[in-house]
Design a protein with these regions (language model features):
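Conserved polar/disulfide-associated segments of primarily extracytoplasmic proteins
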Residues: 7, 19-148, 153-157, 179-194
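Stable alpha-helical elements in mature extracytoplasmic
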Residues: 13, 63-64, 68, 162-169
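Short aromatic-glycine motifs in intrinsically disordered, low-complexity regions
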Residues: 1-10, 73-76, 161-164
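Generic low-polarity alpha-helical segments
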Residues: 2, 147, 172-176
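Short conserved aromatic/hydrophobic patches within beta-strands of well-structured domains
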Residues: 8-22, 169-177
Length: 194
């Protein structure tokens, strides 16, 4: 069980997974047996929107499209000849036993690369599959912030990974209330909560 008492969330993670430092996320874990399998938690800034419910982001479908767009931006490549295909596989609302509302979103992104980026004609630049990944996100709110646990796995292994790790980790993800001044008070005091 990973518990962050400062930011206010917890989730179960496989004990063999290792923490990756310096990833830019609140926390990042990777499966050492398959480095393409990983998870991280991202939290909205307290100085941005105040979220009272995950529904503040939109419907599950609208939220899935926003996450897909953001994920594609994060995966932007500066290499020539890169093409990405993406789709929303699933977007649904889930209410836990305590009445907390979550969104469960599953995306699939394929990346194609040209082996000869400088070819003169399209025939000289054939696209080959570089990678194919499935992304699962569980979003919830607490403390006026939006929390996202995002996990990824190679698509061909997703169903196996989903049963072994992703569902258990996702369903265990829970933001909780922390004892911290609201963002408006923190700003008045000159504090920066990130």
């Amino acid at each position: 069980l990973y518990v962050d008492t400062i930011d206010g969330y917890e989730f179960l993670r496989p004990s063999a997974w290792v923490e990756v430092k310096g990833s830019g996320n609140d926390i990042f874990y990777r499966n050492p047996g398959n480095v393409e399998e990983n998870c991280f938690v991202a939290i909205s800034s307290p100085s941005s929107n105040v979220y009272t419910s995950v529904r503040d982001v939109g419907t599950p479908e609208e939220t899935a499209r926003k996450i897909l767009k953001q994920t594609l931006i994060e995966l932007t490549s500066t290499r020539l000849g890169i093409v990405r295909e993406s789709e929303v596989l699933d977007a649904k609302e889930d209410v836990d036993k305590d009445g907390n509302v979550f969104y469960d979103i599953t995306l699939r992104i394929k990346s194609y690369a040209a082996k000869n980026q400088y070819g003169l004609t399209p025939e000289d630049r054939p696209q080959t599959l570089e990678w194919d990944r499935t992304f699962y996100s569980r979003l919830g709110t607490e403390n006026g912030r939006l929390y996202e646990l995002r996990m990824q796995s190679p698509s061909e292994e997703f169903e196996e990974s989903k049963e072994q790790y992703l569902v258990g980790m996702g369903k265990s993800f829970r933001p909780f209330e922390v004892d911290a001044p609201p963002p408006s008070v923190g700003k008045q005091l000159g504090l920066n909560f990130i």
